Regions:
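Canonical Radical SAM [4Fe-4S] cluster-binding loop centered on the CxxxCxxC motif
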Residues: 40-69
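Conserved, mostly hydrophobic/aromatic
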Residues: 37, 50, 89, 145, ...
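Short Fe-S-cluster ligation motifs
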Residues: 74-92
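Hydrophobic residues within beta-strands of alpha/beta enzymes
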Residues: 53, 86-89, 143-145, 231
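Flexible, acidic/Gly-rich N-terminal and inter-domain linker regions that tether
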Residues: 1-48
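Short acidic, glycine/Ser/Thr-rich loop/turn "cap" segments at secondary-structure junctions
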Residues: 55-61, 87-97, 120
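Residues forming anionic-ligand binding surfaces in small-molecule and nucleic-acid pockets
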Residues: 48-52, 83, 148
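Conserved AdoMet/S-adenosylmethionine-binding subsite of the radical SAM
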Residues: 72, 95-231
Length: 231
């Protein structure tokens, strides 16, 4: 059955709210300015049971997916019409993390090949293979991996089947930071991409037996040790 595009936006933007927004085009704060971004999930099909998520696997709800090429075309058109300045692309985990990441990269690769030089914020998946990070960093202006929690105990409560906190998310975030640092030594880079806007992450606050001090400690480590731009 054919699904109208506006209905697809309506459902995919629900999932995108877990990345700080409830609408597909929203005003992001950047260096004292408001930047309109197109924000969406690539798919709402998910295999995981994260306690806070509207699209957890066991929940009965409509499931939608964008084809990478189509999403790239829509983004390019909105950018040319000056309705947006960038794309924030995240996703639920369908099949496995590598599969989803390949589809994300297919989307942003197509967008860059269309001549798009606007902002791209790419949210990478937990457990994803490190060899995807280099291309993601080259294509996107900001990249990140969601920690979801300040420590492994809270993570296990929130994300019981998402892998281990240290291995699946924290190590991936450290890998991203390491790969971004490697690109800083390169002298010939375009004016877009190459994670020029840095690395970010997010944590869910108050959905488990967490406390403010845990989040403060972890946030301090993220900013001072890893050098993240936003938590």
């Amino acid at each position: 059955k054919s699904i109208k595009r506006r209905d697809k936006w309506r459902f995919l933007r629900i999932g995108a709210r877990w990345d700080r927004s409830v609408v597909p085009i929203y005003e992001a704060a950047a260096r004292g300015k408001c930047v309109p971004l197109l924000k969406t999930l690539l798919t709402s099909h998910c295999r995981n049971e994260c306690a806070y998520c509207a699209f957890r696997a066991s929940r009965k709800c409509p499931r939608m997916t964008w084809e990478p090429r189509k999403l790239a075309e829509i983004t390019k058109r909105l950018w040319e019409e000056r309705k947006i300045m960038g794309l924030f692309l995240s996703s639920s985990v369908f099949k496995d993390s590598d599969f989803v990441t390949e589809r994300q990269l297919e989307t942003v690769r197509a967008l860059r090949n269309m001549g798009y030089t606007g902002y791209i914020h790419l949210r990478l998946m937990p457990d994803v293979n490190r060899h995807y990070f280099r291309e993601a960093i080259e294509l996107a202006d900001r990249v990140g991996v969601n920690l979801e929690a300040p420590n492994k105990e809270v993570f296990s409560e929130l994300c019981p089947d998402k892998g281990g906190f240290e291995e699946s998310v924290r190590k991936r975030l450290e890998w991203v930071v390491d790969e971004v640092r490697k690109t800083k030594t390169e002298t010939t880079k375009p004016k877009f991409g190459f994670a020029g806007a840095g690395v970010d992450t997010q944590m869910i606050v108050g959905a488990a037996e967490d406390n403010d001090w845990q989040h403060i400690q972890t946030t301090e480590w993220l900013y001072k040790k890893l050098g993240l731009k936003r938590v």
